[in-house]
Amino acid sequence: MHFLIAFVEKATKYSLLLFIVLVGCSNLLEEVDLEDLSAEEIYAKAEKSFVSGDNIKAAELFLEIERIYPYSSLAKRALLRNAIALHKEKDYDSSRASAEKFINFYPADKDVPHAHYIIAIGYYDQIDEIGRDQDITYEALKAFRTIIERYPNSDYAKSSALKVELAFDHLAAKQMEIGRYYLQKSHYIAAINRFRIVIEEFPTTSHTPEALHRLVESYLSLGLKKE
């Protein structure tokens, strides 16, 4: 019985060791084989990872195409796909870097508007709440305006125009938040300045009606009924 137990334990250890070795060899072969794959094969693997939701793996594989086959026809497309995968992973800085690299390397390519849009939407997707620093909103506006001005007939220009209005709404919301605070604290002049910004700079936003109402309220509180 003791011999049988010892044999089973020994066999289990050897099986586990063999499994570890095989897994290690498999991973090693995968890494080595990547160099031997064609650009098309690596691209297919990258797309498969992307579709399955493994954005990090997809981004890495797309980047490998540029490294191994920098002059292939797929290198250009892979760079843009890398930017998209990184954006989906919410790695906005790296995504923008890849998109900017694409624009710099292929300035005349038909997908340059798309690359600009990736940059713009990366900023836009970081506007998550009105209490956040609004610098990111201005960066988004700048990027969207670039698309509208340079590629006015593209689908990206239409989407950018809509996003500009939404970004304006974020900025107006921030001004309203500050204006309400000043009004509550009876700092009427400061409140008036904020509400005027909404009315004059963001007149088409959903916050304009309230801004007008608060502006009148602030003037009445100052006793300036004729303003």
Provide a role label for each language-model segment.
Residues M1-C25:
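Sec-dependent bacterial lipoprotein signal peptides
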Residues L4, C25-E227:
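Acidic, polar-rich low-complexity tracts and alpha-helical solenoid repeat scaffolds
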